[in-house]
Amino acid sequence: MKKINQELIALFDKYGSDRRRALRENKKLSYLYALADLRENLLDWCQFDPEQQALQIGADAGALTGLLARRLSSVTVLDVSEENLEVVRRRFKTEPELAAKIRYVCADVETYAREAEKRGGTYGYVVLIGDLTAADRAGRAAQMTAAKQLLSAHGTLIAAASNWFGVKYMAGA
């Protein structure tokens, strides 16, 4: 298990949903990045249809999962690492109303899209925040194509990528 994931799980176990207290008592930039409510600013302005479901590609310590769960009927968190998914599970363990709306899937987006196509599963929102994991342009294009395939007919793809200027981060993500 990655050290940061172990540390975050320990914080969630100790502080539950009191992330502000966890941050006050544990001053580390990596904790701030993972736990700060400010990260929700990236999507806070979006007017979501509460009847829709979202697919969040990349667990990202659950930084945006809570906002999606509060605003939508359900959220599926897709990540290639079971360890990353466990961090999100622990984050919402003490918030049963949100935890009940979150589903976890350990897979890559391309495999998940192929499986979803067979069973007809699509989402009103697909959220891809900085999780383009392929090293080359063709691989990233394949990931975006797979994300698009997971959208319902009138669905919305929300994407924000890390960049040299840190604009994503200045926006709160």
Name each model feature, range by range:
Residues 81-83:
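Conserved SAM/SAH-binding beta-strand->alpha-helix loop
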Residues 139-156:
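A short glycine-rich, Lys/Arg-flanked "PGG" loop and its adjoining helix->strand segment in the class I
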Residues 33-52:
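Conserved alpha-helix/loop element of class I SAM-dependent methyltransferases that forms part
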Residues 61-72:
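Conserved SAM-binding loop of SAM-dependent methyltransferases across substrates and taxa
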Residues 97-111:
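Conserved SAM-binding strand-loop segment of SAM-dependent methyltransferases
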Residues 88-89:
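Conserved SAM-binding loop
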Residues 50-60, 159-173:
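Conserved class I S-adenosyl-L-methionine
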